[in-house]
Amino acid sequence: VCTTTHIYPEKTMPCLVSPAQAEIAAALEKSPCICVGAWSENGKFGPPELPVGTLARLADYVIVEADGAKRLPLKAHAAHEPVIPPEANQTILVVGASGFGRPMCETVHRAPLAAQALGVPEDTVVTPALWARFLEHEHLHTRVLVNQADLPQGRELARRLAAGLCCPVCAAALQKEWIECLS
C-alpha cells in the first residue's frame, strides 16, 4: 500500500519509510501486506521513493491511494486529480453510501465542480442515479466500491448506483471486512 499524495501511516500493517527494494522484499516475507512511503507534512506518508513499477515487481499487488476527499463520502475531482500512476491497470473509485440522500454541499468534496458538471444547484440531494451520472461524466474509474453499505438501505443504494454505471460495482463495509460484488 502506498500513495501518490498523502496518507496517514497504516496502523494495521508494517510501515516502511523510504525502504530499499531488499527491505521491501524482506518485509513481504514476514507480512502479506505492508505500507511504504516517505515522511511528508503533518506526520503523513507521502509517495514512496521507488517507482510503482518497481513495487509491482516486488509484490503480488500494489494498492495506491491516489486521492482523498477530506473525509467526505463523495468527491468531485479537480483537473489535476487523481494522480494515477502510469503503471495502473485498475482504478477503483471508493464512494461512501452515507453521501446519498443528503445535499451535495454537505457530502461532496468540491461540490461546486459536481454541481456545475451536472447542471444542478449545490443543495441538490445526491441520489445514486445522479451520482452514477456524475461518475460516468468524470470517467476516472474501471471499478466502483460503495463503502458504508452496512448502513440502513446501504446495499439497495449501492445496487441503484450500480444500475447507472458501466463497470463492476461492489458494496462493502470495509471496517467490518465485508464485501459483496453486485455486478
Q: What are the residue ranges of the model-derived segments?
A:
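Conserved catalytic-core segment of NTP-binding enzymes
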Residues: 42-58, 67-168, 176-183
